Amino acid sequence: MHNQAPIQRRKSTRIYVGNVPIGDGAPIAVQSMTNTRTTDVEATVNQIKALERVGADIVRVSVPTMDAAEAFKLIKQQVNVPLVADIHFDYRIALKVAEYDVDCLRINPGNIGNEERIRMVVDCARDKNIPIRIGVNAGSLEKDLQEKYGEPTPQALLESAMRHVDHLDRLNFDQFKVSVKASDVFLAVESYRLLAKQIDQPLHLGITEAGGARSGAVKSAIGLGLLLSEGIGDTLRVSLAADPVEEIKVGFDILKSLRIRARGINFIACPTCSRQEFDVIGTVNALEQRLEDIITPMDVSIIGCVVNGPGEALVSTLGVTGGNKKSGLYEDGVRKDRLDNDDMIAQLESRIRAKASQLDEARRIDVLQVEK
């Protein structure tokens, strides 16, 4: 295995979104948001289940109308993952979905209404033991803050967040997390840094409206990576103008890259050159698709020649080093076998699945021994 990153997590309080612990050292939760019409119950349920299959810990659902609130009730009955209801403008919708076993309420201080309306939402959340996310966004700051600062700034986002944190404090409500999102990486990062120094509540990370699948993933990896490497963040969402399933995949890829949380296979692959002895790119692309169901954490290196292949294989769970007609297969740093280059994908898939089963069984035995 590669060296573990010495990231010290920021200390934060613990809340629960459904059965998912957030903060106080809990694994960083990866979430996404549906992009279906919430009133289309079947489509929304299908999308949530697709997100569950790729590992989503939490899913947010927009609830813009009372009709959507009624649909939310039906959706909640058909899925297992905790659901966050995303509420804007009408506080009464928050009160309605609270009746339907919602796991968390996301409210935007910039548009939810006056303090009395916020108090009503908080009182309801307290009575039903529902946590709240205060979701500050650079694109929807309160009018007085827009006038005061002229444009979104880290100080403006911080002031908006602290205004509503203080309000919840006055109401003796501490079951909440906070986000200060912006589409600009530096604005978002600095806003989170300032907020992390002011409060000890869990922080939900995100670069909002980051862009399409490629550009959005890059922006999110930079912004979230900076914050996570500093120990900031308890949950995250990668916001992409793409299939929400991709948000979960990219989120876990970011966490895997920082060695904060492992899920599934971490592929290490060379970009290829004329020295490659087999089709590295085709092999990696095929295996990523074929092995999406594997959740066992492992490093798999796929290197096309002997320049860097042996070195990467030494620190990988499984590693392939390109050779003439046959390539060397390493397991836990030890050379074990040779694989035919012409049948690399099928052979390597079989070996990876077998290794995953072996690791799963070893972990199961370890758990049983601890329980005894």
Curated annotation (Swiss-Prot):
GO molecular function (one): 4 iron, 4 sulfur cluster binding
Note describing how the cofactor binds: Binds 1 [4Fe-4S] cluster.
Pathway(s) the chain acts in: Isoprenoid biosynthesis; isopentenyl diphosphate biosynthesis via DXP pathway; isopentenyl diphosphate from 1-deoxy-D-xylulose 5-phosphate: step 5/6
Top-level enzyme category: oxidoreductase
Keywords from the UniProt entry: 4Fe-4S, Iron, Iron-sulfur, Isoprene biosynthesis, Metal-binding, Oxidoreductase
InterPro entries recorded: Dihydropteroate_synth-like_sf (IPR011005), IspG_bac (IPR016425), IspG_bac-typ (IPR004588), NO2/SO3_Rdtase_4Fe4S_sf (IPR045854)
Cofactor: [4Fe-4S] cluster
Superkingdom classification of source: Bacteria
Record Pfam families: GcpE
Binding site for [4Fe-4S] cluster: 270, 273, 305, 312
EC numbers: 1.17.7.3
Keyword Oxidoreductase attributed: yes
Family the entry assigns: Belongs to the IspG family.
Function: Converts 2C-methyl-D-erythritol 2,4-cyclodiphosphate (ME-2,4cPP) into 1-hydroxy-2-methyl-2-(E)-butenyl 4-diphosphate.
Cross-referenced HAMAP family: IspG
Protein name: 4-hydroxy-3-methylbut-2-en-1-yl diphosphate synthase (flavodoxin)
Native source species: Salmonella paratyphi B (strain ATCC BAA-1250 / SPB7)
